[in-house]
Amino acid sequence: MEDKKVLLSIKDLQVKFRVRGRILTAIRGVTLDIYENESIAIVGESGAGKSVFTKAFAGMLDSNGFIDQGDIIFNDAELSDTVVPLNSYAKKTIASTWEKLNEYSKLEYGSEVFLKMKALEQEKEEKMTLSEEEREKADAEIKELVIKRTELFNYKQTLDTSKEKAKIKETSAEISRLDGEIKALQKAKEEKIKAHKQAAMNDTAYNQAYDAKMAEYKKEYAGLTAKEITDETRKRNEILAKEIYLSVGRYKLRKKVRMIKKLHEAFKAAMERGVDLNDEQKRNGVFDQATFRVRYLDETPEQLHGTCIINLAKIQDPNDWGQIRGKKIATVFQDPMTSLNPIITIGKQITSVIMKHQDVSEVEARAQALELMEKVGIPNAEQRFDDYPFQYSGGMRQRIVIAIALSCRPKILICDEPTTALDVTIQAQILKLIKDLQKEYNYTIVFITHDLGVVANIADRVAVLYAGQIIEFANVEELFYDPRHPYTWALLSSLPQLAERCLLYTSDAADD
């Protein structure tokens, strides 16, 4: 893979879900590079995290799911290249931002003293509340009871109100008892905090020493932050001001103003704490608090030009996902009938996707749709263009789903068990179609499956997923002929060994 470009780089990815008052981890520290024009299979049992993993970089996590940590860097030159018009509003905004950054930069001179003041404030706050050990102990006791209460409440929801009244009454009483204990523990915690606070307020010697030290720090800080900044810092801030505008240039006016304000606050806080903004990683981190950073490259009198690192783990705006999902990363799901709208014609479903992501007329979209239908093997495409999904067989519906996925020529095609709901005789045809079209469209296949037989036919490399972790990663030949992990051995051993059974039967028959 050394000669191929990394298309998607996943580093230490963790995906979690909020479920019934708990946080559950579905993906645990996955690191993986996916290359251009390759076929990679993600295999594992049901519940291993295969679909969640791919949904994380397709922006399709359920509402209770979130990326807790990690990066998903998507390398796409077209999306990375950013051009923003340099109109009067842009010039005025950049000038205003530059002026503010120059003012904030004075705070960098006093960053060491600022951190000392914050540390002193933190020390006083800790003195006025529980120690870390006391807090952890109190929180652990409360959390244990809350978990018990949640489990009982969920259990109560499963009981039959007409047949299990006694159990419901007993469970309700236990829930009420736990509620009382939780309130008592919370009250005890609050009283301890009040006692600590009162003791700290009555400590006259400490308070006098604190006030004197804080006054000393404030005087020193005022002197340091009164200095003028250097020309080098001004030049840095000019570039930063342009990068801030480049980074929010794609938003509508109201959101643009809101995001600029958020970035101003983020940079002020960073300068107060002495963050080295000449360090690319640290600068990116400041931008990530609001949006991903667009790095300044050059400009003309009419426009600013920049480039960005697209970190899919940090994208929050639905409009940003609209530029990626479908257009750059497409998905073929397991059941074609649930992927298609039953009351809209096949042709309309394909053309609507084309028109959404491409600047084409309905006539041009129809021509593209017919061409795609022919390429995926739909006979008499012109006659079947206005048919509804129920008029197609399962295999034909899946071919249409593939056509929709490929309509915008994506860089990555995620195939989430696309043959599971199909007849065995159709599965091989769909797999062959996906591989054949890859040669023409040059997309990367990410194939999710629990069927190792499918892996052998379609994949170049295989990642074995277990409990949200990649426990083995190898090319197809190595995985089948030299598996290293016991779980991989078990998966391979679960395959039917028809040849061996036949041989044993023949041997027994010969002995007879």
Question: At which residue positions do the language-model features occur?
Answer:
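Short catalytic/signature loops enriched in Gly
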Residues: K4-V6, L79, K124, G306-I309, ...
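The feature captures the beta-strand-to-loop junction immediately N-terminal to the Walker
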Residues: V43-E45
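Conserved small/polar residues in nucleotide/adenosyl-binding loops
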Residues: A48, Y505-D512
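A short, proline-enriched helix->beta-strand linker immediately N-terminal to the Walker B motif
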Residues: S407-K411
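Catalytic Walker B motif of ABC-type/P-loop ATPase nucleotide-binding domains
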Residues: L413-D416
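P-loop NTP-binding/switch modules centered on Walker-like glycine-rich loops
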Residues: P418, L422, I426-L503
